[in-house]
Amino acid sequence: MMDSSGYGLLQYLQKLSDEEFQRFKEHLRKEPEKFKLKPISWTKIKNTSKEDLVMQLYTHYPGKAWDMVLSLFLQVNREDLSTMAQTERRDKQTKYKEFMKNTFQHIWTMETNTYIPDRSYHEFIEVQYRALQDIFDCESEPVTVVVSGSRGGGKTTFLRKAMLDWASRNLLQNRFQYVFHFSVFSLNNITELSLAELISSTLPESSETVDDILSDPKRILFILDGFDYLKFDLELRTNLCNDWRKKLPIQIVLSSLLQKIMLPECSLLLELGNASLSNIIPLLQYPREIIMSGFSEQTIEIYCVSFFNTQTGVEIFKNLKSIKPLFNLCRCPHLCWMICSTIKWQYERREVASRFGRTLGLLYTIFMVSAFKSTYARNPSKQNRARIRTLCTLAVEGMWKQVYVFDSDDLRRNGISESDKKVWLRMKFLQNQGSNIVFYHSTLQWYFAVLFYFLQYKDTRHPVIGNLAQLLGEIYAHKQNQWFHTRILLFGMATEQVNSLLEPCFGCISSKEVRQEIIRYIKSLSQQECNEKLVVHPQNLFFCILDNQEERFVRQLMDRFEEMTVDISDVDDMSATPYCLHRAPKVKNLHLHIQKRVFLEIHDPEYGDLELFKLGQKCSFTTNFGDGLLFCTFLHLPHLKYMNLYGTNLSNDAVERLCSALKFSTCGVEELLLGKCDISSEACGIIAASLINSEVKHLSLVENPLKNKGVMSLCEMLKDPSCVLESLMLSYCCLTFIACGHLYEALLSNEHLSLLDLGSNFLEDTGVNLLCEALKDPNCTLKELWLPGCYLTSECCEEISAVLTCNTNLKTLKLGNNNIQDTGVKRLCEALCHPNCEMQCLGLDMCDFTSDCCEDLALVLTTCNTLKSLNLDWNAFDHSGLEMLCKALNHKACNLEVLGLDKSLFSEESQTLLQAVEKKNKNLKVLHFPWLKEELEKRGVRLVWNSKN
């Protein structure tokens, strides 16, 4: 039986006579070819009924059925049906638009907080609005647009305005026939749903069927917001589905839509906050971005004038502008409303205006207390506490359950009476949303949820609400969840200043206990084995500390850490980092990564609003960066011994400031890693000069274009008797054999250097021969030489062999990824068997030798008593060759402890042989990439950063 989805098409086929219907089917045999689709078999449609044919059309040609039918009506001379169908469809589309217009006009008028008059709002969003129009006007193909920006910056409001304007025929009329707006967090409690059911839930009566609507998906736009509040994760999936009729877990439906598996021809307009941006972006195909940048200075002035009367508004605007940190907060529309509301309440009570401060915890508390006093100023604190606690319980229960829309049962269950609800609505703590209730802004739900723990610290059993320790676990263990945004408020409210505001109104506040619990948790976090090298994104901890700023508390927290990895991804991160690290006296090892985009934000107007940074004094730190204070902050940490800036682009000026800080007597850094910092040969000279009298013993400059000129400067440093450098890492530095000439002299005069890494440079045999001349000199004390990927051949093995037989200092030699071949390996084996050879670690991985060398290598294993580690990875030898090696490994004279081999590349028989050797020889480990971890650590290379770089 025909379901309702195909009824619209069927009613028109019913108007065809039998003879017309037969001709219709005959033309249908060729019609799909016009759409580049496969035709339905004639045997399936020859005798089919009209009802069955509709089902087949929707099944075989989803999204194209109506286009085909309208074309076929013309071919059977029923232009009247084609015209009638198109007219009726337009009428139904018009009715849908009218329905959406009325719906969103109500939402816009009653439930949307624009904070400014409509005319001014249009000016506020002019740039973003024009960008939205341009994107869809220029692109005929499906487009995915992401609206991003700070919390409370107006993203959701912008999308509601776009929906209202489309329904009012003022936006994208020629592009989209249907636009659907969904807040995805409303799907949190739905287990399974089809996209068809989701769309149907928004349609008024007498609408087109879902099949008809989706018959032209390129004319459909989905507007989706609320991703920050989803209970479930959306991630790259393989179990996606293209059937929009099929009932599926809601996360599969959303992922399939976002990843363009379901309805790939439709367009998407998404609101993504900070909590969801990094998770959702990887799912999208070539997304375009529109950024909501907040209020301009002019908009703030308009807002103040419209919020107060004209003269008062002008005065308040001037006062706000004179307090730069506070004025910068006003750029966020929601915070601007809070600040002005607070001032208005204080004016009405003729109170002295509060000093707002610059922390969010303090700002929200001043706002809440001012609002509360406007109604309950004379009530006893015990009564006030009981009343506000009901609102806090509603908020925190919602957070734990991930519920953001409440009904009357939710309010009653948490003790909120009808009279209290009216007060909360009047205070703008809550607002109506249809027949339900939501917090006036999502951040207010976070605030009252956190306030719950200050009003009721002692554990009370609740089936849903977790205690403070559990809350901290949710914030830091799971990171991106519904608690993501509360972490700053929790720290910001745990201050004596906030305590002094709350206690007169609500009685005793548990600020001290909350601080102690935070310290206990951070202590446990810093001591966990898995966090031995704690990776800190400033937003996760430093911003929280910055919102507290109580010196004793901050130092108690930062005193817990001895090693940190800090990833700085924007200017705000840069402003928070030095404040916190300056209060971390025990940090010994610091991995610091400043993403390239940070410097673009500072210097390039296209990547950031420089005026905004200046107004908010956010640039003070970045300006100080140029004066060297950034490095002073880090390098003057009393216990700091290890500093890693891998991946941070440093200009010559920045390098100069860094080196100036290194020269201070208070700097005790012994390991300095500057890999991939875009350091030039000129900057290398600056570094070399600064290290002559420093305490730096380990220097990594890998992946920098130092060239031969830069190495020449380093060699001058090495020749200075005051230089105490022991390790120098120079892989991927664009060096040639000429650099080896400079190093020759340095190796003969430096007594401290024990490790030299020259991997992946174009040294060739000529360069290595020069190094060998130095190594044969008894004055050369080098212990490790890394030469992987240096374009060596078997020709240089003669000189290397001579070194092995006369130099007893050299213990490690890495020759991997060179074209040494059988001839070279055999020559090296002769030297390794020499009684004077004391080699301990030898790398021959990827050296293009065969099983012909295995007999020679086997002899080395039983002859060279000092050899402990041998890397033979990625070489082509067969089972017979492996047998010879294993026989030697089982020999009592073999002292090898590490053998580099990828066991998975060998046959099952060979793997069994290796396993037997490992079982017999308990001291031996057969490993793939046996030295990779050590090499990356010494070079300071970070493989993965949590960044958008």
Curated annotation (Swiss-Prot):
Keywords for this protein: ATP-binding, Cytoplasm, Immunity, Inflammatory response, Innate immunity, Leucine-rich repeat, Nucleotide-binding, Repeat
One Gene Ontology CC term in the entry: cytoplasm
Record-linked InterPro entries: DAPIN, DEATH-like_dom_sf, Leu-rich_rpt, LRR_dom_sf, NACHT_NTPase, NLRP_HD2, NLRP_innate_immun_reg, NOD1/2_WH
UniProt LRR repeat ranges: 695-716, 724-745, 752-772, 781-802, 809-829
BP-aspect Gene Ontology terms: blastocyst development; inflammatory response; innate immune response
Subcellular location(s) per record: Cytoplasm
Protein residues bound to ATP: 149-156
Record-annotated Pyrin domain positions: 1-94
Family affiliation: Belongs to the NLRP family.
Protein name (Swiss-Prot/TrEMBL): NACHT, LRR and PYD domains-containing protein 9A
Organism of derivation: Mus musculus (Mouse)
